Structures are given as C-alpha cells and as structure tokens.
From Swiss-Prot:
InterPro entries: Adaptor_comp_med_subunit, AP2_Mu_C_sf, Clathrin_mu, Clathrin_mu_CS, MHD. It comes from the Eukaryota. It is a peripheral membrane protein. This is AP-3 complex subunit mu. GO terms for biological process: endocytosis; Golgi to vacuole transport; intracellular protein transport; protein targeting to vacuole. Part of the AP-3 complex, an adaptor-related complex which is not clathrin-associated. The complex is associated with the Golgi region as well as more peripheral structures. It facilitates the budding of vesicles from the Golgi membrane and may be directly involved in trafficking to the vacuole. Required for the transport via the ALP pathway, which directs the transport of the cargo proteins PHO8 and VAM3 to the vacuole. The keyword Protein transport applies. The keyword Transport applies. Pfam families: Adap_comp_sub (PF00928). Adaptor protein complex 3 (AP-3) is a heterotetramer composed of 2 large adaptins (APL5 and APL6), a medium adaptin (APM3) and a small adaptin (APS3). It comes from Saccharomyces cerevisiae (strain ATCC 204508 / S288c).
C-alpha cells in the first residue's frame, strides 16, 4: 500500500510531495530516517554503493526511481506486501513519469514546470492512486486524466466555481431548482451522446483542432562495448533500445497506419500501446494501425540485440552511430605518447553531432596505480579542449556544442612521470575510451518511418490542413572501447 510520493532533484532537494494520509511523513522526516538507516539511497545512481529501495522501519519500505529523461528522483514510501515486489512500485513510478510528460506535452519536465503546476500534479496523483493502490481502471489513460484535471484550470478555479454554484442553488426558488435540474439532465444526456467514446483512450470532445497534425518521433539509445585488437575493433556486447513517440492532433476518430521499415533488424516482441490493433495475434511493424490518443503518447518500444545479429551474420562490426574510433599507445621517442583519432562519418541527413564528450581512462601496466605518480599532458588537439580529472589517470576531451560530420578530430598527448629513477620500467597506457553524444536525422539501426497514412475517419474541411512527418534522434547510452 502506497503512503506518500515525493519528487526531488538530483541533489535530493524537495520539489513536490503528495501525502495520502494525515500520518504520512513529510520528506523532511523521511530524509532524516533514510540518512540514519540506509544512506546508500542518497548515493548517485552511477555509484557502486547505490540502492534503489530499502526498509526504513517495521513494514515500511522506501523506493527511489531516477528519471533519465527528466533528471529527477521519484520517491515512494509504501507498506511491505508479500503479494507485490519492488518491480510493481518502480513500474508505477515510471508510468507516473510518462503520464506527466504526456499530460504537459513536453519532451522534458523542468523543476519550474512542476512547481508552477503543483495543484494539477496533486490532482493527477489523486487520479492515479486509489485507496493506496494504483488505479488500474482507464484513469491511467492521459485523456481521462485531462478530463478530470483540465489543462487550463487550476485548483482555485475548481473551488471558486463549486462555491458559486452552491450559492446559486441556495438562492434559487424550489420551482426554479426543479426546472434547472431538468435542464441539466437534458444537457447531460446530450453531453453523453456527444462525448461517447469510440475507444477508452480517446474522446470526441478532446479532438477539436484548427489543423490536423500527426508527428512521429523515433529515438534510439545504443549500448556497445568494443575490444581493440591490433588495428581492428571487435564487438563484445551491444544492444539498441528504441522508442516511437507520436504527437497526434487529429479531429474526429481517425484510423492511422504507420509503416516502419526495420532494415532487416530483428526488433523482437515490442511493447505496444493499447491503441495498436493486432490482427490474428501477429504484429507487423510494416503496418501499424491504430486510433490514436489525443496529444503525445508512446506508440511502441523495441530492442535490437546487436551481439546476436553480428554473430549470425558473421560480419565484423567496427563502428556504430556515425562514429569509428582508433587509439595507439607507445608512440614518440620515449614511447610515452598516445594518440586518439575519431572519424565522424559524413551523412547527408545528419549535419552535426551534439554534445560530444570522450572520457579517457589510463592504467599502469603490472603495478599498483597508487605506486606511480603521473599526469597527462596534451601535445595537440584539433577540436575542443581537454580537462584532467582530480582522479589520477582520468581525463575528458570536451567538444563544442556541435561538431560537423565528415571531420576527423585528433588528440595526442604524453604521460609525464614524477619521481622516476634511472631503472624505472613501469608503463602507463590509455586503457578505456568512453563516448557520449547525440545527433538528429538518422537512427543508429537504420530503422525509419516509410509512410504515415490516414486510413479513414478524418474529415478535412476547406480551411483545414493536414500536417504529418517523422523525426529521428540517436544518443549513446554506454559506448566503450577497451584495450
């Protein structure tokens, strides 16, 4: 049973809290308890000591879910249950994160957005939680939440409107009240007819747009680890996680067909929105038909196992995501220099790579790293700047906000040892290189939207236009090259 929910920033500063009862603790009290009983919950998600849930009292457990998109922490305090595991709570927190994005029609939620809409978010939690349990009815559809929590009204307007209606009801004569009730019943029956649902995730009342618009956004995040073998790279493990989001602003109740060309990739069994029609239990990415919800929603999620595809095809994979990387150790007269070169492929649909950062990890060969003191000195770099870490043996090559495709950035440096004698034989090598970047215009797997068609159910007037299109974005998850 859920007792309370909290939203904090990455430094665990409170932004929002929703308490389901008078006995539910504030985040200040919960924070004190967490500090004393399970401080690992306060660690960053990348830390080795990080915990995502822990007991904080008798029959009390706290969960912490980190939203990668919004860079926010979602906390939940719940009573322990033998019938439910941690996955239930994390799934619900992930669903709440998605609902907030779709409700506000945003790609990312800012702290200011949450603070300015505190009352609406409280009402959204009220819709999604019933008697301390997730509301498993149709309320988890965003269109239902938008009906219960209007986007252009706040809590104060609800209260003032209710008070005004009550005052009018008291002042009206009994005869007038009866007439008013009859009119309300008549209007209510007409309203039910007007707002009759074709599908539970869409109502006709919600679909009143000046123009008809339908946009598909395909985002892929890839995770790969390469091993350097002489002058070649060998894929150790790799996968791609893809999501297809849709922004639909269509009138009436149209039937939409999206054709996805997988370019020979095996996307397995994808996770689908309830709106997707499945014929004879078989899903075909080349013909995805659905009556869309109104606004932003996630159409499907898929995964591509690069490791198995490379193994089955027997084709060597040296690069992915427009990038191929090569580095060498033992260069220079004293064999203490290294060079790293990056080939950013020239692609017609991609003009630039954004937020490129490369982490370098050095290692001492056959020795304890603490026994040798050294620093990294840069001799030449064609792009960006290099920053040494406070941790010895680590540094970061930081590029500008955008880097043009078709370029070959090069970084050359050397290892400067401290307090070395004439018989010093230890060697420091560049061991691991990690890349982080993103780009727009192409997916890493090559998957693309072949067609977006309105099959039926859409009436386009003389002054109404239809706009549709697709956008692609690729970003790195974990991209490593190891020696």
């Amino acid at each position: 049973m859920y007792l309370s929910f909290y939203i904090t920033d990455t430094k665990n500063k409170l932004i929002f809290q929703y308490l389901l009862g008078a006995t539910a603790p504030s985040f200040k009290h919960l924070w004190t308890r967490v500090q004393s009983t399970c401080p690992q919950l306060l660690e960053d998600s990348s830390s080795d000591d990080y915990l995502d849930h822990s007991m904080v009292g008798r029959d009390l457990e706290v969960y912490k879910y980190f939203s990668v998109i919004n860079k926010l922490n979602y906390w939940c305090l719940a009573s322990t249950s033998k019938s439910k595991g941690p996955l239930d709570c994390f799934t619900f927190l992930e669903t709440i994160d998605r609902i907030l994005l779709e409700y506000f029609d945003k790609d990312k939620l800012s702290i200011k957005k949450i603070v300015n809409n505190y009352d609406r978010i409280s009402l959204i939690f009220n819709c999604c939680v019933e008697a301390g349990e997730p509301n498993v009815s149709d309320m988890l559809y965003v269109n239902k939440i938008k009906e219960a929590v209007p986007e252009r009204s706040d809590l104060s307007k609800f209260i003032s409107s209710t008070a005004h209606n009550l005052q009018q009801a008291v002042q009206l004569p009994q005869q007038r009240q009866q007439q008013l009730q009859q009119n309300q019943i008549s209007r209510g029956s007409n309203s039910l007819i007007e707002n009759e649902e074709i599908v539970p995730w869409r109502t006709s009342r919600a679909s009143k747009h000046e123009n008809n618009e339908l946009y598909v956004d395909l985002l892929e995040t890839f995770h790969v680890v390469f091993e350097k073998k002489k002058s070649h790279l060998r894929l150790l493990t790799g996968s791609i996680h893809g999501i297809v989001d849709v922004r639909s602003y269509l009138n009436d109740n149209p039937l939409v067909a999206v054709k996805l060309n997988t370019m020979g990739n095996d996307i397995g069994i994808p996770s689908l929105h309830d709106c997707v029609e499945i014929n004879d239990g078989v899903f075909s990415p080349s013909n995805i038909t659905f009556i869309p919800p109104d606004g932003k929603f996630r159409l499907l999620e898929y995964s591509v196992d690069l490791s198995s595809q490379v193994k089955q095809s027997g084709v060597r994979m040296n690069s992915i995501g427009l990038m191929s990387l090569h580095f060498q150790n033992g260069l220079g007269k004293d064999s203490d220099e290294f060079e790293l070169s990056l080939n950013i492929e020239n692609f017609k649909k991609v003009s630039q790579v954004d937020d490129l950062k490369i982490d370098l990890q050095f290692n001492v060969e056959n020795a304890d790293p603490n026994e040798i003191a050294y620093k990294i000195k840069i001799l030449r770099n064609t792009h960006g700047r290099f920053e040494n870490s406070i941790i010895m043996g680590q540094g970061q090559w930081i590029f500008d906000k955008s880097t043009a495709t078709g370029t070959v950035p090069v970084l050359r440096g050397c290892i400067e040892y401290e307090n070395t004698g004439p018989n010093f034989t230890k060697k420091v090598d560049l061991q691991t290189v990690s890349l982080e970047y993103s780009y727009i215009g192409q997916s890493a797997s090559g998957i693309y939207v072949e067609a977006i068609d309105i099959v039926s159910g859409l009436t386009i007037g003389k002054n109404t236009k239809l706009y549709k299109g697709a956008k692609y974005k690729t970003q790195t998850g974990n991209f490593q090259v190891r020696l």
